[in-house]
């Protein structure tokens, strides 16, 4: 694993994570992760979140108990400086915390920011997400590469795709690609980017036996889509237990107006 470089070691740019604004990324990330911990999404230091503010990217560190995270624990890097780096695997951090290591999720978060112009990316270890990938695994090769569900109201919580206006409708089919897990998280990057290319309209990628990455134009959209996905994953697991299909052919109901 590549070690990070940090600019301006004299003062470590601590001002980048100091703000009284509750909506500042350095304050939002700990608040979000504390909430996600109560949902079981970031148990045992797993998972994480990152927020982009123009050129600056704020990242939760590795190994931190997410419910106890503080603004001082946040890493900050510059997308422009990262783009100019000769070694793309080498991180150029503007600000680094004293007691933690950079998250191996970092290159995956950066993929969401650079390939989808996302403003926020969330990674959870939701057990519902993991269960869905295990259920898909039983479908056999060729049928385990995407999660699909339709005719469920919560699908309306997802946008139609990158650069498109509006949200999916009740009868639309939501498709989430599944990639295989790797021993080291950063090695997922290439597979995540391939899934983004193959599914240009997706806002999420499932990682088999691991969890899910979800991104959005801003924190609000990333968070609400992550919540909607977790709802759908739980619903899908329970539907499977009842023998109910995830994809159905239902004729639209049209009201009769007099």
Curated annotation (Swiss-Prot):
Residues annotated as the enzyme's active site:
153
Binding of Zn(2+) occurs at: 123, 125, 210
Detail which positions bind substrate.
Answer: 105
Q: Which InterPro entries did the record assign?
A: Aldolase_II/adducin_N, Aldolase_II/adducin_N_sf, MethylthioRu-1-P_deHdtase_MtnB, Salvage_MtnB_euk
Please give the pathway this protein is involved in. Answer: Amino-acid biosynthesis; L-methionine biosynthesis via salvage pathway; L-methionine from S-methyl-5-thio-alpha-D-ribose 1-phosphate: step 2/6
Cofactor(s) annotated in UniProt: Zn(2+)
Tell me the SUPFAM superfamilies matching this sequence.
AraD/HMP-PK domain-like (SSF53639)
Q: Which reaction does it catalyse?
A: 5-(methylsulfanyl)-D-ribulose 1-phosphate = 5-methylsulfanyl-2,3-dioxopentyl phosphate + H2O
Q: Name one Pfam family in it.
A: Aldolase_II
Q: How is the cofactor bound?
A: Binds 1 zinc ion per subunit.
**EC number, UniProt record:** 4.2.1.109
Gene Ontology CC: one annotated term = cytoplasm
Q: Say yes or no: keyword Metal-binding present.
A: yes
Where would you find this protein in the cell? Cytoplasm
Keywords of the record, alphabetical order, are:
Amino-acid biosynthesis, Cytoplasm, Lyase, Metal-binding, Methionine biosynthesis, Zinc
Q: Where is this region: Disordered?
A: 1-21
Q: Name one GO molecular function term.
A: methylthioribulose 1-phosphate dehydratase activity
Mind telling me which Gene3D superfamilies this protein's record contains? Class II aldolase/adducin N-terminal domain
Biological processes, Gene Ontology terms: L-methionine salvage from methylthioadenosine
Q: What is its main location?
A: cytoplasm
The record, for PANTHER family, names:
METHYLTHIORIBULOSE-1-PHOSPHATE DEHYDRATASE
Return the similarity comment: Belongs to the aldolase class II family. MtnB subfamily.
Its function, per the record, reads: Catalyzes the dehydration of methylthioribulose-1-phosphate (MTRu-1-P) into 2,3-diketo-5-methylthiopentyl-1-phosphate (DK-MTP-1-P).
What is the name attached to this protein's record? Methylthioribulose-1-phosphate dehydratase
Organism of derivation? Neurospora crassa (strain ATCC 24698 / 74-OR23-1A / CBS 708.71 / DSM 1257 / FGSC 987)
């Amino acid at each position: 694993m590549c070690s990070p470089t940090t600019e301006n070691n004299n003062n470590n740019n601590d001002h980048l994570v100091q703000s009284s604004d509750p909506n500042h990324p350095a304050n939002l990330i700990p608040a979000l992760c504390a909430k996600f911990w109560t949902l079981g999404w970031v148990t045992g230091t797993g998972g994480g979140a990152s927020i982009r503010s123009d050129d600056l990217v704020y990242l939760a560190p590795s190994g931190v108990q997410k419910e106890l995270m503080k603004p001082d624990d946040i890493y900050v890097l510059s997308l422009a400086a990262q783009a100019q780096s000769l070694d793309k695997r080498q991180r150029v951090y503007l600000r680094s915390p004293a007691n933690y290591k950079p998250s191996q999720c970092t290159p995956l978060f950066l993929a969401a920011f650079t390939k989808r112009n996302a403003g926020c990316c969330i990674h959870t270890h939701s057990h519902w997400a993991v269960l869905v990938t295990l259920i898909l695994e039983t479908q056999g090769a060729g049928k385990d590469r995407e999660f699909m569900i339709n005719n469920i109201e919560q699908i309306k919580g997802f946008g139609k795709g990158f650069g498109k206006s509006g949200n999916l409708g009740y009868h639309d089919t939501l498709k989430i690609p599944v990639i295989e897990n790797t021993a080291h998280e950063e090695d997922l990057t290439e597979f995540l980017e391939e899934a983004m290319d193959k599914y240009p309209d997706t806002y999420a990628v499932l990682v088999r036996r691991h969890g899910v990455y979800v991104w959005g134009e801003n924190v609000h959209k990333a968070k609400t889509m992550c919540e909607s996905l977790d709802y759908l994953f739980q619903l899908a697991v329970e539907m499977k237990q009842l023998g109910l299909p995830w994809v159905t052919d239902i004729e639209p109901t049209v009201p009769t107006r007099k």
